[in-house]
């Protein structure tokens, strides 16, 4: 989906802290409709705290947060239900209920927000979301303990998609996955963004993910957002953390990987045309 100029998330002057430790101070951020928006930063920069503030699980010291044009700070849970229905969240590690099956985990938000919905329809929706997330259909009756790490991530994603959200929050979705599993999750995220018209707020430390699927990236450091833009735009900034992160060995490897993938995509049509030319 093409990115629009409409802001889905706006954060202004955000200040967060725990006791004497200030995590954010004067943080500003805007996320546009239809983009995959990456958030990166070193340990302790409060990436997850920022997400939790946006979705109402963390109360900031000061600042303003709007989602879909609705003010979120100091809003009663019952008053925010209509906004909360419009987003889905995949927490780091999946955060599945261990005593519920995969299908029952997916059904949780449906039962919470639509208690009068026909149970048969809830079952049908859950089964569809399980498959949509890339899990086999027979994963529904399984418990989280029976799943691999990658399958747990997809089960958590299925639950995040249960309400047909417009906005999807992903907290370190590829953490703990092997390179093949991480790349597959990236491809799934990009595919869903296009087909479902999602806006994606993505916290990650995975450089391959940033290069592969993010439209824009925000860098957290010094208690605020120090830069927002595409990777080339960020590389034009002279902040030492940005330069070390994107121009370090792993950053160069990610760049080379993306460039090689682009070369292979460009070569594929030529090879196909050559093969047709030799037929008959």
Per-region residue spans from a language model:
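Catalytic Walker B motif of ABC-type/P-loop ATPase nucleotide-binding domains
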Residues: 168-171
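Conserved ABC ATPase "signature" region
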Residues: 71, 119-138
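Conserved ABC ATPase signature
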Residues: 143-147, 151
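The feature captures the beta-strand-to-loop junction immediately N-terminal to the Walker
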Residues: 40-42
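Helix-to-loop junction immediately C-terminal to a conserved catalytic motif
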Residues: 55
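Conserved catalytic motifs of ABC-family nucleotide-binding domains
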Residues: 164
């Amino acid at each position: 989906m093409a990115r629009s100029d409409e802001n889905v998330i706006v954060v202004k002057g955000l200040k967060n802290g725990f006791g004497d430790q200030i995590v954010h101070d004067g943080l500003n951020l805007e996320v546009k409709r239809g983009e995959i928006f990456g958030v990166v930063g070193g340990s302790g920069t409060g990436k997850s705290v920022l997400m939790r503030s946006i979705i109402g699980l963390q109360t900031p010291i000061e600042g303003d947060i709007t989602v879909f044009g609705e003010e979120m700070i100091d809003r009663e849970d019952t008053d925010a239900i209509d906004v909360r229905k419009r987003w889905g969240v995949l927490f780091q590690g999946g955060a599945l209920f261990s005593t519920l099956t995969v299908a029952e985990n997916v059904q949780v938000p449906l039962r919470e927000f639509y208690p009068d919905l026909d149970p048969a329809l809830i079952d049908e929706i859950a089964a569809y979301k399980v498959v949509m997330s890339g899990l086999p259909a027979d994963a529904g009756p399984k418990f989280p303990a029976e799943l691999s790490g990658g399958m747990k991530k997809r089960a958590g994603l299925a639950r995040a998609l249960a309400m047909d959200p417009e906005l999807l929050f992903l907290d370190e979705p590829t953490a703990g996955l092997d390179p093949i599993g991480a790349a597959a999750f990236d491809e799934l995220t990009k595919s869903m963004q296009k087909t479902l018209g999602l806006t994606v707020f993505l916290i990650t430390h995975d450089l391959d993910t940033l290069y592969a699927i993010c439209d824009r990236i925000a860098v957290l450091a010094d208690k605020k957002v120090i830069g927002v833009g595409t990777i080339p735009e960020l590389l034009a900034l002279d902040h030492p953390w940005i330069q070390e992160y994107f121009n370090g060995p792993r950053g160069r490897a990610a760049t080379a990987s993306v460039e090689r993938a682009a070369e292979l995509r460009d070569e594929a049509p030529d090879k196909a045309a050559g093969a047709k030319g030799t037929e008959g």
